[in-house]
């Protein structure tokens, strides 16, 4: 019993040490493995103190001989920002006690700033980090960048050719339903063939992979890119080729399904309208039936009253 207990205790200690090591490694690398990752850390900069500083910068009027903020470099912007915030006067003076009261509710998101004295100024560009983006500039540039990914305006769905994926179906004049069934049969057939390839010894061979031009470049730049880097040789096997073919088939199926989204939305809207019409018809039929029942009841009451009046008259 004691030996078994010691073994379990030792296993628990080992598991705890392993979990601590993993936690320490994750904290060191700052990698989030959560299914719902936390928001970007830029939200910590939106404190009440920084927003007050931003109001001071926006209320400051530049002299005629001073260049605009957009013409300054990053270092020059920080120097001007610190110079404006250090100016004495009521417009640039922030009461420390008032700031402490205002930031008491935001202590959870300002753990790193709480240890700093209130006289410390931000070490980042307030106008660049806290001001909302300029919509005119976004429309002029034709898109915006979020977390390193470019989103064009209006939103444009890239074609399979632009993604470097071969098109496995004719582009025009074909029923998409039949195309999806054909691609599904191709996927199943390729899956059966790849199971047979796994039972045979691998025989690698070299294939030429052509380069795909960058769709964001101009045609002249694309030609220059293809001239300098037309492609490369790589080693592959039949199993790898079939696996790549299966991936291309799945992407083609997804692309066709996405093209059917407007049709699906249209048919769904038709179905909803038909359901609403049928419900209105059922409600109208129910009302008519109730009205007919009430009329019949009223007629019965009239007949009963007529018979009673005849009986009283004859008596």
From Swiss-Prot:
Protein name (Swiss-Prot/TrEMBL): Mediator of RNA polymerase II transcription subunit 7
What's a Pfam family this protein contains? Med7
Any Gene Ontology biological process: regulation of transcription by RNA polymerase II
User: What is the role of the protein in this entry?
Assistant: Component of the Mediator complex, a coactivator involved in the regulated transcription of nearly all RNA polymerase II-dependent genes. Mediator functions as a bridge to convey information from gene-specific regulatory proteins to the basal RNA polymerase II transcription machinery. Mediator is recruited to promoters by direct interactions with regulatory proteins and serves as a scaffold for the assembly of a functional preinitiation complex with RNA polymerase II and the general transcription factors.
State the SUPFAM superfamilies in the record: Mediator hinge subcomplex-like (SSF140718)
Renumbered to this chain, the Polar residues biased-composition regions fall at 25-35
Q: Which PANTHER family match?
A: MEDIATOR OF RNA POLYMERASE II TRANSCRIPTION SUBUNIT 7 (PTHR21428:SF11)
**What keywords are annotated for this sequence in UniProt?**
Activator, Nucleus, Transcription, Transcription regulation
Q: Segment Disordered: which positions?
A: 1-36
Q: What family name appears in the similarity comment?
A: Belongs to the Mediator complex subunit 7 family.
What is a GO molecular function of this protein?
transcription coregulator activity
**Subunit info?**
Component of the Mediator complex.
- Subcellular location, record wording: Nucleus
Q: Which GO terms of the cellular component aspect does the record hold?
A: core mediator complex; mediator complex
Record's InterPro entries? Med7/Med21-like (IPR037212), Mediatior_Med7 (IPR009244), Mediatior_Med7_sf (IPR044888)
> What superkingdom does the record give?
Eukaryota
